[in-house]
Amino acid sequence: MLKVFNPSPVQVGSIECLQSAQNWQRKSLSLQGLNLLQSVLIKLTTGKISITTSSGEYITASGPMLIFLAKDQTIHITMEETHEQLNYNLIELDSASIKNAYNFFLYEHADFSAPLTKPTTKHLLAPIETGVARVFNLLHSSNKSQKLSQDKKEYLIRFLLSEFIYEPEAFALFRELSQNTLAENIYNIIISDISRKWALKDISDSLYMSCSTLKRKLKQENTSFS
């Protein structure tokens, strides 16, 4: 598992922990140290969510709400019922999908001047409009069944991310997230065959680099392999 170097280590888990936690059927749940190696899209249908991020942001939202969380951060998250039972789902988005959407938005909005400055936020929020929930559910279920073509999935992702494009930070954030990190490349290799027990040598061979080079580059990203 990939872990972030922290001065005061906290329990680090994958984002799948958040998805499976819904099955606990609690009125509230709190998870510490979820490490986002890919960007995440959360569809909060009912309930309330509070998130503290390693970048210093505090996010709070109530459903129905679409929440985009950028990769390369660790989050502490609390979710609770409001007047209805807590209901949410999430989808991980890789850099290639975000880059595809970003390039499409630039083409469609040629008159829009995308800022070249670094984004000051690592999240975006949008109310869930008509049709969005249905598209999200289709993409979420297809990720499990692998029934949709890649082109169709890219189209659905563009549709969902278009909900955020009029947010001031959206273009700058999508541009930055279009670039793969080494940690994300490793994550993609591992999830391609989750039944396999991956060793450092396996990963380094897949990336055509030595183990020492791999460890050095990961350290530069403030990440380790264990």
Question: Predicted segment positions?
Answer:
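N-terminal regulatory/effector-sensing and dimerization cores
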Residues: I15-K118
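Short, Lys/Arg-enriched, Trp-marked, Pro/Gly-tolerant hinge/linker segments that flank
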Residues: P119-P127, K144-K153, S162-D202, S206-L207, ...
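Intrinsically disordered, low-complexity regions enriched in acidic/Ser/Thr/Pro/Gln residues
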Residues: R134, L138, L160-S162, N185
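A general structural signal for short secondary-structure boundary/capping elements
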Residues: Y88-E92, A110-L116, R134-S141, Y208, ...
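A short, N-terminal "cap"/entry segment at the start of jelly-roll beta-barrel domains
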Residues: M1-S14
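Key DNA-contact positions within bacterial/archaeal DNA-binding proteins
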Residues: S212
